[in-house]
């Protein structure tokens, strides 16, 4: 199972049911469970991470706010943003948390390079940035030596809701999206992202599914 990966393409989903399913998957997995990556677009939602503060919610309006258990502070998810959840057995992969964060940042940097876009991580604020504007947010949780939660990469979306918050706790943090820099589709980016992940984390066997995780 160490080198096997299942990628679930879940389409457009509300945040809370997917979050609950990640918990169930992580609670029930054991040393024989293969790693999974879930690709999803969420309906509009603000999520507060464990370090989130109420004062960073400026004017949420009609968009719901969900208190999440991932690391980090507040962010926005919405249609046109690629969310990838990494359900990885870190002990089996012999990875530390910081190593996984670096791998995920590099995964996005390599994916953007595929489109001739130069980007970088920042030591003071996890995520990936293009010319100091944030294109990808990152937040993880580790339980039983396994990761869940993941990244949110802005592809082709309405960025206006980010103005209603201090993204990741930074007032005035400017956001950017891939379609501002290069014409691209969600499907193309998914494909490149998974190829880069397989290379970075050394998976040898990859299977794709459009079925949601069912814990029963």
Curated annotation (Swiss-Prot):
Amino acids binding substrate: 70-77, 137-139, 150-152
Pfam short name (any one): LplA-B_cat
Entry keyword annotation includes rRNA processing: no
Pathway stated in the Swiss-Prot or TrEMBL entry: Protein modification; protein lipoylation via endogenous pathway; protein N(6)-(lipoyl)lysine from octanoyl-[acyl-carrier-protein]: step 1/2
Domain BPL/LPL catalytic residue range list: 31-205
GO cellular component, as recorded: cytoplasm
Subcellular location: Cytoplasm
EC annotation from Swiss-Prot or TrEMBL: 2.3.1.181
Catalytic residue list: 168
Top EC group: transferase
Catalysed transformations (reactions): octanoyl-[ACP] + L-lysyl-[protein] = N(6)-octanoyl-L-lysyl-[protein] + holo-[ACP] + H(+)
Domain of life: Bacteria
Site, as annotated: Lowers pKa of active site Cys: 134
UniProtKB keywords: Acyltransferase, Cytoplasm, Transferase
GO BP term, pick one: protein modification process
InterPro entries: aa-tRNA-synth_II/BPL/LPL (IPR045864), BPL_LPL_catalytic (IPR004143), Octanoyltransferase (IPR000544), Octanoyltransferase_CS (IPR020605)
GO molecular function: lipoyl(octanoyl) transferase activity
Similarity comment: family membership: Belongs to the LipB family.
Function: Catalyzes the transfer of endogenously produced octanoic acid from octanoyl-acyl-carrier-protein onto the lipoyl domains of lipoate-dependent enzymes. Lipoyl-ACP can also act as a substrate although octanoyl-ACP is likely to be the physiological substrate.
Note: In the reaction, the free carboxyl group of octanoic acid is attached via an amide linkage to the epsilon-amino group of a specific lysine residue of lipoyl domains of lipoate-dependent enzymes.
Name listed for the protein in its UniProt record: Octanoyltransferase
Organism in which the protein naturally occurs: Vibrio cholerae serotype O1 (strain ATCC 39541 / Classical Ogawa 395 / O395)
Gene name of the encoded protein: lipB
């Amino acid at each position: 199972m160490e080198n096997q990966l299942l990628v679930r393409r879940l389409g457009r989903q509300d945040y809370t049911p997917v979050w609950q399913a990640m918990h169930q998957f992580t609670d029930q997995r054991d040393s024989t469970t293969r790693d999974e990556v879930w690709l999803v677009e969420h309906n509009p939602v603000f999520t507060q991470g464990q370090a989130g503060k109420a004062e960073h919610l400026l004017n949420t309006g009609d968009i719901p706010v969900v208190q999440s258990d991932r690391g980090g502070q507040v962010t926005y998810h919405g249609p046109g943003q690629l969310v990838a959840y990494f359900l990885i057995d870190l002990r089996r992969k012999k990875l530390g948390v910081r190593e996984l964060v670096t791998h995920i940042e590099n995964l996005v940097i390599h994916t953007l390079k595929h489109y001739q876009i130069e980007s970088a991580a920042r030591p003071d604020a996890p995520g990936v940035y293009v010319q100091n504007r944030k294109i990808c947010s990152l937040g993880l949780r580790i339980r039983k030596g396994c990761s869940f939660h993941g990244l949110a990469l802005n592809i082709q979306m309405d960025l206006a809701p980010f103005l209603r918050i201090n993204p990741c706790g930074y007032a005035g943090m400017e956001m950017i999206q891939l379609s501002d820099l290069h014409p691209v589709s969600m499907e193309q980016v998914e494909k490149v992202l998974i190829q880069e992940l397989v290379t970075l984390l050394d998976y040898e066997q990859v299977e794709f599914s459009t079925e949601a995780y069912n814990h029963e």
